[in-house]
Curated annotation (Swiss-Prot):
Function: Catalyzes a salvage reaction resulting in the formation of IMP that is energically less costly than de novo synthesis.
Catalytic activity: IMP + diphosphate = hypoxanthine + 5-phospho-alpha-D-ribose 1-diphosphate; GMP + diphosphate = guanine + 5-phospho-alpha-D-ribose 1-diphosphate
Organism per entry: Methanospirillum hungatei JF-1 (strain ATCC 27890 / DSM 864 / NBRC 100397 / JF-1)
GN (gene name): hpt
Protein's name according to its UniProt entry: Hypoxanthine/guanine phosphoribosyltransferase
GO terms (BP aspect): IMP salvage; purine ribonucleoside salvage
GO CC terms of this entry: cytoplasm
Keywords noted in UniProt: Cytoplasm, Glycosyltransferase, Purine salvage, Transferase
Pathway: Purine metabolism; IMP biosynthesis via salvage pathway; IMP from hypoxanthine: step 1/1
Length: 182
């Protein structure tokens, strides 16, 4: 269903960091370059996967969700709202506690109001820590989360809301495709 994405995952390098096998991929790391055909295939797949009915914003987290959200935006004319790693101190700014399997930090939401119908897209979900923080903050604002989609699902993340993905992978000394959405 996603031949360019699947081939790029099957051929991407694996880097060992301590006990962790880390896959290095254009969509998750920007290394090597992000091929336009890959990005187009992903955007088309995500548009088919997501409920975009009456959505005000495509929301994504800085940094690697940005190319995905932008490609979807260009195809749908739905504006992108980026959850940033920098605090701007603007009125209505909302903090997000970001906890991943390997780090902890803060992110910041701006420009989303009560009643805004949004979809969230991102490159990869592993543990669900970052996304659960984003969901909690968006719900506290009063945003309506219409849908959540990821390009890649890795492992068995624990997420507070239903979500979809294009491909599910397992990473050992190589990437193995578990399944794909259709």
């Amino acid at each position: 269903m996603y031949p360019i994405l699947v081939n790029s995952l099957l051929t991407c390098p694996i880097v060992k960091k301590g006990e962790y096998n880390y896959f290095v991929h254009p969509i998750t790391d920007g290394i090597p370059d992000i091929d336009p055909g890959l990005l187009r295939e992903i955007a088309v797949g995500m548009i088919r996967l997501l409920d975009l009915t009456d959505v005000k914003y495509i929301v994504t987290a800085e940094a690697m969700g940005i190319p995905i959200a932008t490609a979807i935006s260009l195809m749908t004319d739905i504006p992108v709202n980026i959850i940033r790693k920098r605090k701007y101190g603007l009125p209505g700014e909302c903090d997000v506690c970001q906890v991943t399997g390997y780090s902890k930090g803060e992110m910041y939401i701006n420009g989303i109001c009560t009643g805004d119908r949004i979809v969230i897209v991102d490159d990869v979900i592993s543990t669900g820590g970052t996304m659960n923080g984003i969901i909690k903050s968006l719900q506290s604002i009063g945003a309506e989360i219409a849908d959540i989609g990821f390009v890649i699902k890795k492992g068995n993340p624990s997420l507070k809301l239903p979500y979809s993905y294009l491909v599910s992978i397992e990473v050992t000394d190589r990437v193995r495709i578990i399944d794909q959405s259709f």
